[in-house]
């Protein structure tokens, strides 16, 4: 619910209402919301209670700056270690099988599967842990703004290019492609945010 785009940014999560909706005890709801607050997905304020986090342009840039640093370092470890990433290959194969009607959530899930596979292949516990800490906020960006993900063929082609670069083993080319890929994603997300703010102004 938090990451599927059904809640508007800033929506209040009233304990009584959501406990009933989800069929869980209120203390379970409180424990779950605290976990999501710690992950940056929810925020608690004195007057408004628990709300879905609202990301601004600075948040997006900050999240993707950390994401880029982690993924580029993971790429270095993968290429210099000559590691194989079958899960990334599988994600690209699934991308290739998508039609134009694929849901944004399907595209986002494959996108994250690809990038998560790269992180996992680096075989670094600390990179993995750091990436896990920001992954929920990456997904929140995508859920709230959703640009680009309605063009599955374009997203598939980008990830195919990234995979081919990794397999070719040219570190500089691959790093540059990943930086461009994530830089374009940051720009798409911030543009979508600006467009949304203009509509609601």
Q: Across the structure, where does each feature detected by a protein language model lie?
A:
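C-terminal all-alpha effector/ligand-binding and dimerization domain
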Residues: 89-96, 136, 143-201
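Short linear motifs at protein or domain termini
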Residues: 1-83, 186, 190-201
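Amphipathic alpha-helical dimerization/coiled-coil segments
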Residues: 71-100, 106
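Hydrophobic residues in alpha-helical segments
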Residues: 2, 78, 99, 122, ...
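Hydrophobic, amphipathic alpha-helical faces that serve as interaction scaffolds
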Residues: 66-80, 112-150, 188-189
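Positions in alpha-helical segments
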Residues: 50, 61, 73, 93, ...
